Design a protein with these regions (language model features):
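Short beta-strand to alpha-helix junction loop
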Residues: 1-14, 131-140
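Short, conserved active-site loop motifs that form the nucleotide-linked donor/cofactor pocket
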Residues: 19-21, 181
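General small-molecule cofactor/ligand-binding pocket signal
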Residues: 21-23, 164
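A conserved short coil-to-beta-strand element within the FAD-binding core of flavoproteins
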Residues: 24-38
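Conserved FAD-binding catalytic core of PHBH/FMO-like flavoproteins
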Residues: 39-41, 46, 53-165, 173
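Active-site acidic short loop of glycosyltransferases
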Residues: 49-51, 178-179
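FAD/FMN-dependent oxidoreductases across multiple families
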Residues: 130-226
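C-terminal helical "tail/cap" subdomain of flavin- and related membrane-associated enzymes
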Residues: 211-302
Length: 302
């Protein structure tokens, strides 16, 4: 797993190499779609014109709201606690996810830091009121709570850096595109982190949209035309809905200590482990591979 600040740093350096301007700290005030372009007016009064506006501004997307695209959504009553921990022993590149009554507890391997310390990223799901209480505790109490779930398999642990919690829910846009407008990433779909697939879905969106736009431009088509953008929507919509439903069912099944459901989930895990093709499907989804993968994610040029 790559730390967010490392990924952001790499993207910024690449953008600078390509001469891409990054405008920060200025919100979009409004946008207007014309026959050949879309005009985006920023809060500082600057207007930008383009053939296509891509909204990738998060699960509470203001641009999606401005475009009038509705969503299907519900709240899980859970929050995800995120932090980085330093531990004595190396993780060996192993990611783990444990299913607890309040929700999944995932340990994701990170590269050692500049001092060579072993590190992992934690995504820890709790009932919302408990998550708020845990995050507000002092460092010692927080680390005790964390150790109860993390265990001592990697030796002593300590929290490295800030910790935060964010509310979890399911949000699926009813449509991904309009003329000269496309949703991507969390603006199109916000899912439960139980399978760690939110970022992978966003990468697939970006790669698929890039492939559709490049191919349309190569053929002399208008990249902002609705029929072009609908190719992107058809490509990505089924995958995102499928993953949203899958994570919703898994969360309801595993984040539960009700006796019959506990038995059912144990049976379900046993079935998956004994059927290679079914197991391969879940592994391919977790790895962000499988059918319908854009060429960029396979390392191919477009």
């Amino acid at each position: 797993m790559v730390a967010n600040k490392v990924l952001n740093g790499s993207l910024r350096r690449r953008a600078a190499e390509l001469g891409i301007d990054i405008i920060e700290g200025v919100a979009v005030d409004r946008f207007e779609v014309g026959a050949a372009t879309v005009a985006v007016r920023l809060a500082d009064g600057v207007t930008l014109d383009a053939r296509l506006l891509v909204a990738a501004d998060g699960v509470r997307s203001r641009l999606r709201e401005m475009a009038g695209i509705k969503t299907v959504e519900w709240d899980y009553g859970q929050s995800g606690i995120v932090c980085t921990v330093v531990h004595e022993r190396p993780h060996g590149g192993r990611a783990e996810e444990h299913f607890l009554p309040a929700g999944p507890f995932a340990t994701l391997p990170l590269k050692p830091d500049e001092q060579g310390r072993n590190r992992s990223s934690i995504v820890w799901t709790e009932r919302r009121e408990d998550a708020e209480r845990i995050v507000a505790e002092d460092d010692l109490v927080f680390e005790v709570e964390l150790e109860q779930r993390f265990g001592l398999k990697l030796g002593e642990i300590s929290v490295d850096g800030p910790r935060r919690a964010w509310p979890l829910g399911l949000t699926l846009a009813r449509g991904f595109v309009k003329p000269r407008f496309a949703l991507a990433g969390d603006a199109a779909h916000g899912i439960h982190p139980i399978a760690g697939q939110g970022l992978n879905l966003g990468f697939k969106d970006a790669a698929a949209l890039a492939e559709v736009v490049v191919e349309a431009d190569r053929l002399g088509q208008d990249i902002g035309a609705l029929d072009v953008l609908e190719d992107y929507e058809r490509w990505r919509r089924f995958d995102t809905v499928q993953m949203g439903v899958t994570t919703d069912v898994l969360n309801r099944l595993f984040s539960n200590d009700f006796g019959p459901l506990r038995t059912l989930r144990d049976i379900g895990l046993g079935i998956v482990d004994r059927l290679p093709r079914l197991k391969d499907f879940f592994i391919s989804q977790a790895a962000g591979t499988g059918e319908g993968i854009p060429r960029l994610l396979k390392g191919e040029a477009i």
